[in-house]
Amino acid sequence: MELNFTLNGALRTVITPAGENAQRVLFNQCRMHSVRNSDDGFGFAGSDAILFNGKVINASLLIAAQLEGAQVRTAESLGSWNQLSLVQQAMVDVGVVQSGYNDPAAALIVTDLLDRHPEPSRDQIDDALSGLFHRDGGYQQFYQAIELASSRLKDPDYLCQIAPEFRDDLRHIGKSCPKVDAAKMVQAKPCYVEDRVSEDALVIKMLRSPHPHAVITRLDVSRAEAMPGVVHVITHLNCPDVYYTPGGQSAPEPSPLDRRMFGRKLRHVGDRVAAVVAESEAIALAALKLIEVEYQVLPAVMNIGEAMAPNAPLVHDEPIVYMAGAPADLEQQNACSVRRGDEHMIINFPIGSRPHENLAASVHGQIGDVAKGFAEADEIVERTYESTQAQQCPTEPHICFTYMDGDRLVIHASTQVPWHVRRQVARIVGMKQHQVHVIKERVGGGFGSKQDILLEEVCAWATKVTGRPVTFRYTREEEFISNTSRHVAKVKVKVGAKKDGTITAIDMDFRANTGPYGNHSLTVPSNGPALSLPLYPCENVRFTVNTYYSNICPTGAYQGYGAPKGNFALTMAIAELAEKLGIDQLEMVEHNRVHEGDILKVLGAIGEGKMPTSVPHAASCALELILKQGRELIAWDSPKPADGDWRIGRGVAIIMQKSGIPDIDQANCMVKLESDGTFIVHSGGADIGTGLDTVVAKLTAEVLHCPLGDVHVISGDTDHALFDKGAYASSGTCFSGNAAKKAAENLKEKILFHGAAMLGEPVADVELAFPGLVRGKLGEVSLAKLAHKAETGTGFGILVGTASYITSELAFPYGANFAEVAVNVRTGEIRLDKFYALLDCGTPINPELALGQIYGATMRAIGHSLTEEICYDGKGIPLTRDLKSYGAPKIGDIPRDFRAFLVPSDDKVGPYGAKSISEIGVNGAAPAIATAIHDACGVWLRKWHFTPEQILRELGKLEQQASA
């Protein structure tokens, strides 16, 4: 079918199959990279927004035939190749652009809005952006960007302070500046994996299990293999016989190596049955229908209680092999195992695992005398709190593209962990690490989900077998049933306190549901107590962590990494105890909270796959100022008058996070001086939209006294950078950042040495000076001149600084969330009127990006608290398979008064006093909202997310108690 239409002012003619989707035509044939597919045509995400005959519409909702004769405008029409449009510049300046995946579409929508309404109201903004799913940024900064763009329409030279500034003694650190990669993302320049896929690439489509628990008894792929255009079919019969964990963690991984690329036993709906590798997506999908499979359906276990039950069906019944530290009864454990060929599970070292009891991992410990502490208490509360299954929902689905370059395998990946991908894939497909080149492209959102290896190994194996380029991309349905998600948890907390509110003992029993595989099954749940108990230092503390296998869809890493569930349970228990004692919740928090300098004794008993080498302390903590400021902002002590059926309540939660994993992880960096006096940084860090490349560039420029524009960062490329553990555990700033700072300092020493020689002065008399000078007492020399000298035949060789960063110290960001809700006692409706997130991340390296991280993380946490959940039917079949039914929030769902604040402290671990920022924001919304709900209407909601039905049910119980 021939189509003729006008695209960005030019006539276009394309030939496309009848019934083709307009988004695919614009992206694949017209190479409009701004028209991206995020939700498979559901029309929810808005990343495919175009102007169609002057109106904003999602291209995926159009069939190609509707393009005939149409006027189509995409984000490529904004600005020019090397010049941002007014709206794009405002978005970049304010810090809206993080992962960037749907920001070109956002820029087009906002441009259309300002064309129609040069000074739009909030309602007009909300209406215009109502079709955009902006998972990473949290929406709030769009108002600021639109206000800035509107002001510049009237005055092109209009300037305003984008964000507060910090550290007057520094040039770059603590000052706002655009992300170094923001322009290319908002302009839709090719930078994501899908932009790299070659036209001759084969396509993988996966046949997945329809059952939560089953064994394949017959598998016939012969008809699929015989289909024209099918190149290969991968099954458990011809895949590598290698066991691994999908979890992207440092080796040896603290997770069971409990999966094979394909296995006979299927452990969740969506588990892999067979992969068709074909010349096109259409052929691959057709071939899937030709595969014949017979299953022996097994009883499923879907929750912790079922998994713990005596004689429960076993999710993993295969033999167990230990690499070290095998338990004395291993032979007895294996005696009852089921042998299917050579299937087995590998455990690297003891993690408290008993798979044949559905126990994936466990850990326990205590400090002090818990029994004595409870005996000293005047009041004790013991409660159980639960969380549901939440999904990360990155706007860019998982995607991979692989090809052979000679005898080397090249992997373009949307990943948080390029070096872990290289190590894992090389082992799985039988290659050496130097034969595998992983290129982390820009990542359209991760939030933990792209820490795991979920499709890279299949794509790599297909390329190795066929010798052809191959691409594999998840559908949004696959994101829900085959991607990882947040662990479901059930946490029992017992807290005792004296009459004055002093906590005397805490006992936390943390039980987690890891689903079908054990990736992160030790480390995520152990962070539940590890990132909540230290907020309330107590002499007598006990914790127990047990993680169980089940047949729900997979779980894994998600921002907060266990902290949200532990913090919810502990905050709620302390709030309930405060009520029993007749003490205000905020006063109870103030009375027991951590203070700067406190020894965090409980962390001496909790490791993350390895016991700590020392007991950490709160080296920097701005909670005193945070709580004072939050109390004033939310008017904590002011009256809360009812409004008809609406009742007003306020709540608070304090939060903490780590900044990397001491004694386990490592980062490396190299900084090279170029012959014109500029610098290239080879950073192993993985920027997944957090602005890490900008942080690395700013740290380098600060040390070397040069303009930020003189620093270029190459990162996340295993051929062209140095090893780094990747983007997880809030490690970017402290680990990758410190490595960059140390490498720059190493180079600085060499520059000063050779600069002093060129000036004929002692090294002690010279220093670096802005912009790019070595200055002595008698004269100065430019870095360009020095670098040119280095490369001449009589020079001293190119100047390169390198550094490795490891540490045994912890840097803890702290914060508090304050919420004000209105609850309708007739309908149960919850309205989040105010939400204030105040965070201490040390010295903010880039303030506007830090604020964006807070808004995005907080909004995800609000979604988890009020609307988001993966649901199952009574047979264990997941019902949630798209963003809309999942309940992901949009701009109309944000609090009407939503503010974020940076409260600085000076930490000694991070570079220039910086601490992490990206994860901590998800840790506090649930308890802040839940305690506010209680303050409003008197009910305690102990399972999140919170629903009107829960409130009405609990209000009914209160009425029954009152009338009894």
Where is each model-derived feature located?
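Signature of N-terminal electron-transfer/Fe-S-associated modules in redox systems
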Residues: 1-165, 392
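Intrinsic disorder at enzyme termini
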Residues: 10, 106, 129-193, 630, ...
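Glycine-rich loop/linker segments at domain edges
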Residues: 95, 175, 181-187, 249-252, ...
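Flexible, low-hydrophobicity surface segments
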Residues: 150-341
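Extended active-site and interfacial segments that coordinate phosphate-rich ligands
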Residues: 184, 289-302, 416, 423, ...
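C-terminal catalytic domains of large/alpha subunits in multi-subunit enzymes
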Residues: 237, 337, 430-437, 465-470, ...
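Helix-loop-helix junctions that connect adjacent transmembrane helices in secondary transporters/permeases
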Residues: 316-429, 595-678, 698, 806, ...
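Thiamine diphosphate
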Residues: 423, 437, 442-467, 471-473, ...
